[in-house]
Protein backbone atom coordinates (compact mmCIF):
# COMPACT_ATOMS: atom_id res chain seq x y z
CA UNK A 1 0.00 0.00 0.00
CA UNK A 2 1.33 3.44 -0.95
CA UNK A 3 1.94 5.67 2.06
CA UNK A 4 0.11 8.99 2.08
CA UNK A 5 1.78 12.37 2.37
CA UNK A 6 1.29 14.43 5.51
CA UNK A 7 -0.69 16.96 3.49
CA UNK A 8 -3.04 14.28 2.15
CA UNK A 9 -3.62 12.92 5.65
CA UNK A 10 -4.36 16.39 7.04
CA UNK A 11 -6.81 17.23 4.27
CA UNK A 12 -8.62 13.90 4.49
CA UNK A 13 -8.95 14.20 8.27
CA UNK A 14 -10.31 17.75 7.96
CA UNK A 15 -12.92 16.68 5.41
CA UNK A 16 -14.00 13.72 7.50
CA UNK A 17 -14.29 15.90 10.62
CA UNK A 18 -16.57 18.35 8.81
CA UNK A 19 -18.65 15.68 7.07
CA UNK A 20 -17.44 16.84 3.66
CA UNK A 21 -15.64 13.72 2.48
CA UNK A 22 -17.01 11.98 -0.60
CA UNK A 23 -19.13 8.97 0.48
CA UNK A 24 -16.64 6.11 0.44
CA UNK A 25 -16.54 2.49 1.56
CA UNK A 26 -13.07 1.07 2.14
CA UNK A 27 -12.09 -2.05 0.25
CA UNK A 28 -8.88 -3.99 -0.09
CA UNK A 29 -8.71 -3.86 -3.88
CA UNK A 30 -5.61 -2.39 -5.46
CA UNK A 31 -5.72 -0.38 -8.68
CA UNK A 32 -5.24 -3.36 -10.97
CA UNK A 33 -7.93 -5.37 -9.19
CA UNK A 34 -10.35 -2.46 -9.48
CA UNK A 35 -9.70 -2.19 -13.20
CA UNK A 36 -10.26 -5.91 -13.72
CA UNK A 37 -13.54 -5.82 -11.80
CA UNK A 38 -14.82 -2.69 -13.56
CA UNK A 39 -13.89 -4.16 -16.93
CA UNK A 40 -15.97 -7.25 -16.22
CA UNK A 41 -18.98 -5.21 -15.11
CA UNK A 42 -18.71 -2.88 -18.11
CA UNK A 43 -18.53 -5.86 -20.44
CA UNK A 44 -21.76 -7.18 -18.89
CA UNK A 45 -23.47 -3.79 -19.27
CA UNK A 46 -22.51 -3.50 -22.92
CA UNK A 47 -23.65 -7.05 -23.64
CA UNK A 48 -26.96 -6.30 -21.89
CA UNK A 49 -27.40 -3.34 -24.24
CA UNK A 50 -26.96 -5.73 -27.16
CA UNK A 51 -23.57 -4.46 -28.28
CA UNK A 52 -21.30 -6.86 -30.16
CA UNK A 53 -18.04 -7.03 -28.22
CA UNK A 54 -16.42 -9.07 -30.95
CA UNK A 55 -16.47 -5.98 -33.17
CA UNK A 56 -13.00 -4.45 -33.33
CA UNK A 57 -14.39 -0.99 -32.48
CA UNK A 58 -15.96 -2.24 -29.23
CA UNK A 59 -13.72 -5.10 -28.14
CA UNK A 60 -11.38 -2.98 -26.01
CA UNK A 61 -14.00 -0.54 -24.72
CA UNK A 62 -14.54 -2.25 -21.33
CA UNK A 63 -10.78 -2.22 -20.73
CA UNK A 64 -10.46 1.43 -21.81
CA UNK A 65 -13.30 2.52 -19.52
CA UNK A 66 -11.88 0.64 -16.53
CA UNK A 67 -8.44 2.18 -17.07
CA UNK A 68 -9.96 5.64 -17.51
CA UNK A 69 -12.03 5.36 -14.32
CA UNK A 70 -9.18 4.24 -12.07
CA UNK A 71 -6.23 6.14 -13.54
CA UNK A 72 -7.91 9.33 -14.72
CA UNK A 73 -11.41 10.61 -14.09
CA UNK A 74 -11.82 9.00 -10.64
CA UNK A 75 -8.17 9.12 -9.57
CA UNK A 76 -9.08 11.71 -6.91
CA UNK A 77 -10.67 8.94 -4.85
CA UNK A 78 -7.13 7.74 -4.10
CA UNK A 79 -5.28 10.04 -1.69
CA UNK A 80 -1.95 8.63 -2.85
CA UNK A 81 -2.49 10.85 -5.93
CA UNK A 82 -2.97 14.00 -3.82
CA UNK A 83 -0.68 16.65 -5.29
CA UNK A 84 2.68 17.39 -3.76
CA UNK A 85 2.04 20.75 -2.15
CA UNK A 86 4.62 23.49 -1.74
CA UNK A 87 3.72 25.84 1.11
CA UNK A 88 6.33 28.43 2.06
CA UNK A 89 6.72 31.04 4.75
CA UNK A 90 5.18 34.39 3.85
CA UNK A 91 8.49 36.25 4.17
CA UNK A 92 7.30 39.09 1.93
CA UNK A 93 4.39 39.64 4.34
CA UNK A 94 1.83 39.67 1.54
CA UNK A 95 -1.49 40.65 3.09
CA UNK A 96 -3.66 41.36 0.04
CA UNK A 97 -5.90 38.96 -1.84
CA UNK A 98 -4.25 36.46 -4.18
CA UNK A 99 -6.66 35.19 -6.82
CA UNK A 100 -6.37 32.46 -9.45
CA UNK A 101 -9.16 32.67 -12.01
CA UNK A 102 -10.52 30.38 -14.70
CA UNK A 103 -9.06 27.08 -13.51
CA UNK A 104 -10.35 24.45 -15.91
CA UNK A 105 -12.08 21.52 -14.26
CA UNK A 106 -13.80 18.43 -15.56
CA UNK A 107 -15.68 16.31 -13.08
CA UNK A 108 -18.40 13.65 -13.11
CA UNK A 109 -21.93 13.97 -11.75
CA UNK A 110 -22.33 11.28 -9.11
CA UNK A 111 -26.06 10.91 -9.88
CA UNK A 112 -25.76 10.01 -13.58
CA UNK A 113 -21.99 9.57 -14.14
CA UNK A 114 -21.90 12.16 -16.91
CA UNK A 115 -19.63 15.17 -17.30
CA UNK A 116 -19.49 18.39 -15.28
CA UNK A 117 -17.44 20.94 -17.20
CA UNK A 118 -16.52 24.31 -15.75
CA UNK A 119 -14.17 26.86 -14.30
CA UNK A 120 -13.06 27.41 -10.70
CA UNK A 121 -11.91 30.69 -9.18
CA UNK A 122 -9.84 30.61 -5.99
CA UNK A 123 -8.71 33.43 -3.72
CA UNK A 124 -6.99 33.64 -0.37
CA UNK A 125 -5.38 36.21 1.87
CA UNK A 126 -1.99 34.97 3.10
CA UNK A 127 -1.21 34.88 6.78
CA UNK A 128 1.87 32.90 7.73
CA UNK A 129 2.04 30.83 4.55
CA UNK A 130 1.74 31.12 0.78
CA UNK A 131 1.24 28.27 -1.68
CA UNK A 132 2.76 27.65 -5.10
CA UNK A 133 0.18 28.89 -7.60
CA UNK A 134 0.12 25.72 -9.70
CA UNK A 135 -0.70 23.75 -6.56
CA UNK A 136 -4.06 25.51 -6.37
CA UNK A 137 -4.91 24.23 -9.85
CA UNK A 138 -3.78 20.73 -8.91
CA UNK A 139 -5.89 20.68 -5.74
CA UNK A 140 -8.96 21.78 -7.73
CA UNK A 141 -8.32 19.02 -10.26
CA UNK A 142 -7.74 16.39 -7.57
CA UNK A 143 -11.18 16.90 -6.05
CA UNK A 144 -12.80 17.22 -9.48
CA UNK A 145 -11.56 13.74 -10.36
CA UNK A 146 -14.26 12.03 -8.34
CA UNK A 147 -17.97 11.40 -8.67
CA UNK A 148 -19.20 14.75 -7.39
CA UNK A 149 -21.93 17.21 -6.66
CA UNK A 150 -20.81 20.76 -7.32
CA UNK A 151 -21.74 22.04 -3.87
CA UNK A 152 -19.52 19.49 -2.13
CA UNK A 153 -16.69 20.00 -4.62
CA UNK A 154 -16.67 23.73 -3.84
CA UNK A 155 -16.52 23.12 -0.09
CA UNK A 156 -13.86 20.42 -0.37
CA UNK A 157 -11.52 22.76 -2.22
CA UNK A 158 -12.17 25.50 0.35
CA UNK A 159 -11.45 23.29 3.36
CA UNK A 160 -8.38 21.70 1.75
CA UNK A 161 -6.80 25.11 1.14
CA UNK A 162 -7.77 26.39 4.59
CA UNK A 163 -6.11 23.34 6.12
CA UNK A 164 -2.90 23.62 4.11
CA UNK A 165 -2.58 27.41 4.43
CA UNK A 166 -3.51 27.61 8.11
CA UNK A 167 -6.08 30.34 7.51
CA UNK A 168 -9.86 30.58 7.14
CA UNK A 169 -9.48 33.44 4.64
CA UNK A 170 -10.19 31.47 1.47
CA UNK A 171 -12.91 31.88 -1.16
CA UNK A 172 -14.00 29.54 -3.95
CA UNK A 173 -16.45 29.97 -6.82
CA UNK A 174 -17.26 27.39 -9.49
CA UNK A 175 -19.31 27.93 -12.64
CA UNK A 176 -20.10 24.72 -14.51
CA UNK A 177 -22.27 23.07 -17.11
CA UNK A 178 -23.82 19.76 -16.06
CA UNK A 179 -24.34 17.25 -18.84
CA UNK A 180 -27.05 15.52 -16.77
CA UNK A 181 -29.00 18.72 -17.55
CA UNK A 182 -27.54 19.44 -20.99
CA UNK A 183 -27.53 15.98 -22.59
CA UNK A 184 -30.49 14.24 -20.91
CA UNK A 185 -33.64 15.03 -18.96
CA UNK A 186 -34.56 18.66 -19.53
CA UNK A 187 -31.97 18.92 -22.37
CA UNK A 188 -31.05 22.53 -21.55
CA UNK A 189 -27.86 23.36 -23.43
CA UNK A 190 -27.39 26.94 -22.18
CA UNK A 191 -27.83 26.90 -18.40
CA UNK A 192 -24.99 26.64 -15.90
CA UNK A 193 -24.64 26.36 -12.14
CA UNK A 194 -22.62 28.68 -9.91
CA UNK A 195 -21.59 27.72 -6.38
CA UNK A 196 -19.61 29.81 -3.92
CA UNK A 197 -17.97 28.94 -0.62
CA UNK A 198 -16.51 31.68 1.55
CA UNK A 199 -14.37 31.51 4.66
CA UNK A 200 -12.94 33.95 7.19
CA UNK A 201 -12.97 37.59 6.15
CA UNK A 202 -14.50 36.71 2.78
CA UNK A 203 -17.59 35.72 4.74
CA UNK A 204 -17.54 38.30 7.53
CA UNK A 205 -16.25 41.43 5.78
CA UNK A 206 -18.55 42.82 3.04
CA UNK A 207 -15.73 44.77 1.36
CA UNK A 208 -13.50 41.70 1.07
CA UNK A 209 -16.38 39.60 -0.21
CA UNK A 210 -17.21 42.30 -2.77
CA UNK A 211 -13.56 42.41 -3.88
CA UNK A 212 -13.62 38.67 -4.54
CA UNK A 213 -16.96 38.65 -6.31
CA UNK A 214 -15.95 41.71 -8.32
CA UNK A 215 -12.80 39.91 -9.41
CA UNK A 216 -14.95 37.24 -11.07
CA UNK A 217 -16.29 39.73 -13.60
CA UNK A 218 -14.71 40.66 -16.89
Curated annotation (Swiss-Prot):
<dbReference type="Pfam" id="PF01227">
    <property type="entry name" value="GTP_cyclohydroI"/>
</dbReference>
<keyword id="KW-0547">Nucleotide-binding</keyword>
<dbReference type="GO" id="GO:0005525">
    <property type="term" value="F:GTP binding"/>
</dbReference>
<dbReference type="GO" id="GO:0006730">
    <property type="term" value="P:one-carbon metabolic process"/>
</dbReference>
<keyword id="KW-0479">Metal-binding</keyword>
<keyword id="KW-0862">Zinc</keyword>
<comment type="subunit">
    <text>Toroid-shaped homodecamer, composed of two pentamers of five dimers.</text>
</comment>
<dbReference type="GO" id="GO:0008270">
    <property type="term" value="F:zinc ion binding"/>
</dbReference>
<dbReference type="GO" id="GO:0046654">
    <property type="term" value="P:tetrahydrofolate biosynthetic process"/>
</dbReference>
<feature type="binding site">
    <location>
        <position position="109"/>
    </location>
    <ligand>
        <name>Zn(2+)</name>
    </ligand>
</feature>
<keyword id="KW-0554">One-carbon metabolism</keyword>
<comment type="similarity">
    <text>Belongs to the GTP cyclohydrolase I family.</text>
</comment>
<comment type="pathway">
    <text>Cofactor biosynthesis; 7,8-dihydroneopterin triphosphate biosynthesis; 7,8-dihydroneopterin triphosphate from GTP: step 1/1.</text>
</comment>
<feature type="binding site">
    <location>
        <position position="112"/>
    </location>
    <ligand>
        <name>Zn(2+)</name>
    </ligand>
</feature>
<dbReference type="GO" id="GO:0006729">
    <property type="term" value="P:tetrahydrobiopterin biosynthetic process"/>
</dbReference>
<dbReference type="InterPro" id="IPR018234">
    <property type="entry name" value="GTP_CycHdrlase_I_CS"/>
</dbReference>
<dbReference type="InterPro" id="IPR043133">
    <property type="entry name" value="GTP-CH-I_C/QueF"/>
</dbReference>
<dbReference type="InterPro" id="IPR020602">
    <property type="entry name" value="GTP_CycHdrlase_I_dom"/>
</dbReference>
<dbReference type="InterPro" id="IPR001474">
    <property type="entry name" value="GTP_CycHdrlase_I"/>
</dbReference>
<keyword id="KW-0378">Hydrolase</keyword>
<protein>
    <recommendedName>
        <fullName>GTP cyclohydrolase 1</fullName>
        <ecNumber>3.5.4.16</ecNumber>
    </recommendedName>
</protein>
<dbReference type="GO" id="GO:0005737">
    <property type="term" value="C:cytoplasm"/>
</dbReference>
<keyword id="KW-0342">GTP-binding</keyword>
<dbReference type="GO" id="GO:0003934">
    <property type="term" value="F:GTP cyclohydrolase I activity"/>
</dbReference>
<dbReference type="InterPro" id="IPR043134">
    <property type="entry name" value="GTP-CH-I_N"/>
</dbReference>
<feature type="binding site">
    <location>
        <position position="180"/>
    </location>
    <ligand>
        <name>Zn(2+)</name>
    </ligand>
</feature>
